[in-house]
Amino acid sequence: MSNDNKIFHLWTSKTNPLKNLSELLRDLLTEGNLECTSKGIRLISVSSNRSVLVHLKLHAENFEEYSCNESLTLGLNMEEYFKVVKLVESNETLRYYVTEEDKNTLAIQRYNKEEDIRNTKFIKLMDIPNDNINIPPISYESVIVMSSSRFQKICKEIYGFSDKLEITSIGNVLYFKSPNTEICIKPTDNNSGIKYESCDNKDEIIQGTFNLKYLVQFSKCANLSDNVKIHIKNDYPLLVECSVAKLGSVKICLAPQTEEG
């Protein structure tokens, strides 16, 4: 396919990660701007109720084909975007493009090589105000890596009883707590449990309570990556991140809840 009239174009066989990512974004955001440049795709957006910040980066070099001749903002309704991408099948590839003639439309094309079928959907782009969010660098006191499937299981289990989750790090021990549950995880010799990437003060108690709904939604990242990385610091937002297969990374940031909140 010629790219002569395309100002933005990517092609990839890594369809499952994009499919799972579209579901994750749909759950967390109503709409958002994909900022496309020659270096890749970035999204920084806050949920409609201002409760969670989502930060996504996909790197150009990780796609089989990628080109972006000028900086573009793709304003997407996340529900509509998910409805299109969820249709992709495991034996299909995905192509995204915007043409010079129609900069207000994103084309998403599925291709089945075996049957030589091209199925193209066209999404009208939205004019979404940018949040203009400046994310300052933060040095977190505890950074913990754990299995994404274990993280998902814990979040779902506790969500059956509570809408809040307390995360506490003491030394090299990590606790997940709710009013009727306490789950304690320690590092193991075979690295099958958790791993502390950093722990500034092993005697300090690092603790925060967070809205569990968004952590349950983000825990679907188990479909994207084997591990999640949890950054926690007293009186600071919680940062949870995972890789998007080998395409990039996605992070969420949650403010701690007060007893009244």
Where in the sequence are the language-model features?
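DNA polymerase sliding clamps and clamp-related checkpoint/processivity subunits
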Residues: 1-26, 31-160, 166-261
